[in-house]
């Protein structure tokens, strides 16, 4: 059970630390259509982490898939990230894309990576300064190195094999309507439903407003799922919100965790795979 979340007060006190690097993981396209309260500003000194392009596998037809380790390391160094860097990630929705970036550095072996609980909303509403989100500058090349944790990223073949082995329990972070197949998918070429034997924990059920629920509330949620001794693989539409519930689980549990990188977009658009509807 890790110390993953930091407060605006903690971050403000750290601003003068030379090892601190703040990563703005906000999506420029806002594909999800989430409400953005504070546009065009960022936390002073924040560096834009381009999750949609630079830090996704552009050879894949799927959104947000993990880039090669080599590319991840190269682009991290371009952002000036070092092995000793203290990384704090936030986004402009509250908690949305930032857990994905936290997870990426976590599984690449970086120890000091945190999420600003509540994101830019909490920062501004606690009275801390912002700056205009200008174009990115160039940074001194960092020395970041990393090694992708074995079994942290699940492929389509891994999930197909798991249908028989049942080594991992799949937890789907999509809304109940999408999971049950009663609501349409945002990508019209993706079928409705869910992977057989997966369970549903909509990501907004671990949040209260723009922040994570308390640890006591999260403990109750995960206890109700009866998953204490299971290895867990997290699924969503495209690998973003799965990381929200993965992070929530790591605040209160000690399961082995992974993310199905292609998530429902891959499963629901691949012919011949079994699909359940509840």
Name what the model sees in each region:
Residues 1-278:
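Cytosolic catalytic domains that perform sulfur/thiol-centered chemistry
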């Amino acid at each position: 059970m890790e110390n993953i979340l930091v407060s605006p007060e903690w971050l403000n006190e750290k601003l003068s630390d030379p090892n601190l690097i703040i990563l703005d993981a906000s999506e420029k396209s806002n594909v999800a259509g989430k409400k953005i309260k504070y546009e065009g500003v960022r936390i002073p000194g924040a560096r834009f982490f381009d999750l949609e392009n630079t830090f996704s596998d552009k050879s894949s037809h799927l959104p947000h898939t993990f880039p090669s380790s080599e590319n991840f390391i190269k682009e991290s160094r371009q952002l000036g990230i070092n092995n000793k860097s203290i990384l704090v990630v936030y986004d402009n929705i509250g908690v949305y894309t930032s857990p994905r970036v936290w997870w990426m550095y976590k599984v690449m072996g970086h120890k000091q990576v945190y999420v600003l609980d509540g994101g830019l909303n909490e920062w501004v509403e606690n009275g801390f300064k912002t700056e205009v989100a200008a174009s990115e500058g160039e940074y001194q090349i960092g020395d970041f190195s990393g090694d992708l944790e074995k079994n942290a990223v699940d492929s389509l073949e891994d999930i197909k094999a798991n249908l028989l082995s049942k080594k991992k329990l799949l937890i789907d972070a999509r809304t109940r309507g999408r999971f049950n197949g009663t609501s349409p998918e945002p990508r019209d070429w993706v079928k409705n439903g869910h992977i057989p034997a997966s369970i549903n924990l909509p990501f907004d059920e671990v949040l209260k407003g723009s922040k994570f629920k308390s640890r006591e509330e999260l403990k109750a949620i995960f206890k109700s799922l009866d998953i204490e001794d299971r290895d867990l693989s997290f699924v969503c539409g495209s690998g973003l919100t799965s990381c929200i519930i993965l992070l929530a689980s790591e605040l209160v549990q000690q399961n082995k965790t992974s993310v199905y990188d292609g998530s429902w977009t891959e499963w629901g658009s691949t012919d011949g795979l079994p699909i359940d509807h509840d």
